[in-house]
Amino acid sequence: MAAAAVDPMVLGLGTSGGASGSGVVGGGVGRAGGGGAVMEGAQPVDLARHPSGIVPVLQNIVSTVNLDCRLDLKQIALQARNAEYNPKRFAAVIMRIRDPKTTALIFASGKMVCTGAKSEEHSKLAARKYARIVQKLGFPATFKDFKIQNIVASCDVKFPIRLEGLAYSHGAFSSYEPELFPGLIYRMKQPKIVLLVFVSGKIVLTGAKVRDEIYAAFENIYPVLTEYRKSQQ
């Protein structure tokens, strides 16, 4: 697949604040410190789980839930705060809450998509809050079939990467067309994760259903990235 096919919103990189995909790669990262101690913020990092000493930071969780009732979207948009509805543009109410800072897409069928949360727990909490808002507007909404659909994370390996060499040697998994998209797209088979690798050393990982897939994918790719570390002039 050509690099042009990568849409940041499809990957779940868009957040509730409408940030562009490129803004995702600036997240924090845990790295090995002196004496072998590894810290992420104030939290120690388990080297058995993260041998690289780098912990990808979750940036966006996309989840879905079934409210299990038909909804009058026009009524919801008129009565709810922080809600907008323009059926000519998009067939869903767009609703936002501040805590957790998220955006929901609410469809007339009762299906809902929640995006923008930074953890699985916050995604579920936000989805429950949206469901309660709909209930308070008079709809018999329930909370069925909650599911994490995509986890997006980012990290920084702190060294530049020779993307041309990586693309050549890993052509079966890689797509790199810098005139169309600045990053190399690496489609890992196991776990089935898509990685966006940038020359700066910034990495975006997407396509996971559970966070351990993110961690496993990064530990798989990290030794490969070190092979293509660009020598500093």
Swiss-Prot record:
**What are its GO biological-process terms?**
DNA-templated transcription initiation
An MF annotation (GO) of this entry: DNA binding
Keyword list (alphabetical) reads: DNA-binding, Nucleus, Repeat, Transcription
Q: Which InterPro entries match?
A: TBP, TBP_CS, TBP_dom_sf, TBP_eukaryotic
Q: Transmembrane: is it a keyword of this entry? A: no
- What are the sequence repeat spans here? 58-134, 148-225
Name its cellular compartments. Nucleus
GO CC term (a single one):
nucleus
Q: What does this protein do?
A: General transcription factor that functions at the core of the DNA-binding multiprotein factor TFIID. Binding of TFIID to the TATA box is the initial transcriptional step of the pre-initiation complex (PIC), playing a role in the activation of eukaryotic genes transcribed by RNA polymerase II.
Recorded hits in HAMAP family, A to Z, give: TATA_bind_prot_arch
Q: Which family does it belong to?
A: Belongs to the TBP family.
Which PANTHER family does this one have? TATA-BOX BINDING PROTEIN
Q: How does it assemble?
A: Belongs to the TFIID complex together with the TBP-associated factors (TAFs). Binds DNA as monomer.
* This protein's name: TATA-box-binding protein 1
The species this protein belongs to is: Triticum aestivum (Wheat)
Q: Tell me the name of the encoding gene.
A: TBP1
